[in-house]
Design a protein with these regions (language model features):
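Hydrophobic alpha-helix feature that most strongly marks membrane-spanning transmembrane helices
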Residues: 57-61, 77, 82-86, 111, ...
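Glycine-rich phosphate-binding active-site loops on the catalytic face of alpha/beta enzymes
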Residues: 11-21, 71-72, 76-105
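Generic structural signal for well-ordered alpha-helices
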Residues: 1-2, 53, 78, 103, ...
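Residues that cap or flank secondary-structure elements
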Residues: 44, 69-70
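Glycine/Thr-rich beta-alpha phosphate-binding loop at enzyme active sites
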Residues: 3-62
Length: 119
């Protein structure tokens, strides 16, 4: 992060796929071995990527625009990513499964949250 700040980059993409299968409970160890290495995406990577966005935001003291990526499947998760320090979010797996309606639903949710009374 320090190098990124010193080098003058315009922003950072935080998150995406992972080769790690830690915490994956939907299939057996044997099946995981059969599938082999490769990038895992979607819901299983969300929490790690959310933590990564928080980490980058804190370490950069909010000086780097961050694109939060990885496992965002709803408006609620997009807002969490933005609240963690992302300037923008990127979706892919959710878009594959839900199509353009996901983008509409995320935008609608964010607009509703923006207009909600502040506590």
């Amino acid at each position: 992060i320090e190098y990124c700040l010193r080098s003058g980059i315009d922003g950072i993409v935080a998150g995406n796929t992972t080769r790690s299968r830690d915490g994956l409970t939907t299939i057996s160890e044997k099946k995981i071995e059969e599938i082999g290495n490769g990038g895992m995406s979607g819901a299983p990577v969300y929490k790690k990527n959310l933590a990564l966005v928080k980490y980058v935001h804190e370490k950069s003291e909010g000086k780097l625009p961050i694109i939060g990526v990885g496992g965002i499947m709803s408006g609620e998760q997009a807002k969490e990513m933005l609240d963690a320090g992302a300037s923008l979010v990127e979706v892919y797996t959710g878009f594959i499964y839900e199509g353009p309606a996901l983008i509409k639903n995320i935008n609608k949710y964010l607009a509703e949250q923006d207009s909600a009374p502040k506590k």
